[in-house]
A protein has these predicted regions:
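Conserved catalytic alpha/beta core of Sir2/sirtuin-type deacylases, generalized to analogous enzyme cores
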Residues: 1-281
């Protein structure tokens, strides 16, 4: 089914729990770059294009060994950018819908920007399958642990592509620390913090009787979110709403496809879902 906003309203109204699944397209509406779109990485970081460095080459543990200054600048710059960006209105719309349900919500996201938590979502109900820049871990994963990055306030030199502030260190072994994000060819990623939330998500799904999955901005380049959304909706025999301006196709007729940007779709659905509130505003 395609572009039927009324059907989206029906699915959300009858649900007793909302599973929000989100890819990079959810963050794009806040003004953040999408590295997986065509030319997206080099458009955001033209200096890497000049040196013919791809996203896959800088987003790897090897970068911390062979190009340490550049790796710390890249992730420090991204952390500063994410912290300085305000999550768009769509996050609050989703939060209002989800908090009204008897079983509430859970978030499954490949985004590492921490914007669901920044928008007020409960961290214990946000499973960040690729980790988050808001946590750090040992470069060598000495204990298999991660910790909050709140005390790490990177100061970046965008001309010389380096940090001017101190690099983070591991509190356990004293070695260097890195962002707690799953990178390419990453065998040292400390997954424990997210693993706990994965278990909570699986337990929550067993409790929900009438699930609706709302997928936002999840592309095909790395289809982790899309596959999880489809698999879960099928297993729970629940409703499924895929929101994507380009890759909105769905595998089943009763699944809903909305060829729209995340924020536009959420606002349009909310207008129909809460007409009295819109009138007051």
């Amino acid at each position: 089914m395609k572009n039927d906003l009324n059907y989206a309203v029906e699915l959300i109204r009858k649900a007793d729990g909302i599973l929000i699944t989100a890819g990079a397209g959810m963050s794009v509406d806040s003004g953040l770059p999408d590295f997986r779109s065509v030319g997206g990485f080099w458009n955001a970081y033209p200096m890497f294009k000049e040196h013919n460095i791809s996203f896959e080459e800088i987003a790897t543990p090897l970068a911390y060994k062979h190009n340490q200054e550049l790796a710390y600048w890249f992730y420090g710059h991204r952390l500063v950018q994410y912290r300085n960006t305000i999550p768009h209105e769509g996050y609050q719309i989703l939060k209002c819908w989800a908090e009204a349900k008897s079983h509430g919500y859970f978030v499954f996201t490949s985004n590492v920007d921490g914007h669901f938590q920044k928008a007020g979502f409960d961290d214990s109900h946000v499973y960040e399958v690729h980790g988050t820049l808001e946590r750090l871990q040992c470069v060598n994963n000495c204990r298999g642990l991660s910790w909050s990055a709140s005390s790490f306030q990177p100061v970046v030199d965008n001309e010389n592509l380096c940090l001017t502030s101190e690099k983070p260190h591991c509190p356990y072994c004293g070695g260097f620390a890195r962002q707690n994000v799953l990178m390419f060819n990453d065998w040292s990623y400390a997954s424990q913090y997210q693993d706990f939330k994965k278990v909570r998500l699986e337990s929550w799904l067993k409790e929900v009787q009438n699930l609706v999955v709302i997928e936002l901005g999840a592309g095909k380049a790395i289809p982790t979110v899309r596959r999880f959304s489809e698999r879960t909706a099928k297993a729970k025999k629940g409703g499924f709403i895929r929101i994507n301006p380009q890759d909105a196709g769905v595998p089943k007729m009763h699944f809903l496809s909305l060829e729209m940007k995340a924020l536009d779709a959420l606002k349009a659905i909310d207008t129909l879902l809460n007409p009295s509130q819109q009138a007051v505003e």
